[in-house]
Amino acid sequence: MRAGSNVKLCTKVLIRNQHTYQGSGVSYMPPKPENGATHSSLSPAQQAYLERVIRVDQAGELGADLIYAGQYLALSHNKKVKPIIKHMWEQEIHHRSTFNKLQSEHRVRPSILTPLWKAGAFGLGFATGFMNKEAAMACTEAVETVIGKHYNSQLRVLSNNFADLKDSNDKFSNSKEIEHLKGTIKVFRDQELEHLNTAIQNDSKNARPYWLLTETIKTVCKSAVFVAERI
């Protein structure tokens, strides 16, 4: 099969999964709040931080989606690994869709460097998948290690700096909107860590050169997070 046909097939699978998995993801997502404290009760600093969270997480999940898309294309011939990557990819599609909606609902501008994230993420996924299965899994291990720590950091800030907000009745209470966001991040963090464990179980540490590959990818991911929060 030609490379062009493979890309078309990969795109069709991505679109199909994007429709099917969103429905299946509803059952494990925390319910969206119907009332309670909202953005109007946040200070300018809190509002700015919340926008950074949504912007960087949307960019990160976009990147994860396309990393797995690249790996899926490169390893589509591997019958053992293909369903494993597909499962993780489907979860990332749902993560991306969720943050796309949050970005739209709260009118948060996307990262200006979104085209770069798209090209870089797909290229990274395809390149490591083209190397071999172990390199692809080492890539997953490195990315999910950074993202797991990133989500934990966000949860600490949201728990410590967004408590006791004033609601519409001028009373102090926990923001249901913030609690919903925290619940969403917790679910996604746990799934990212599942991907990390899956990568280790599928021989990520047998990649060569393991240390150079994983540390390089971690550095790239950390830099991307830093930039996407701000630009």
Stretches with model-predicted labels:
Residues 2-231:
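Non-heme di-metal
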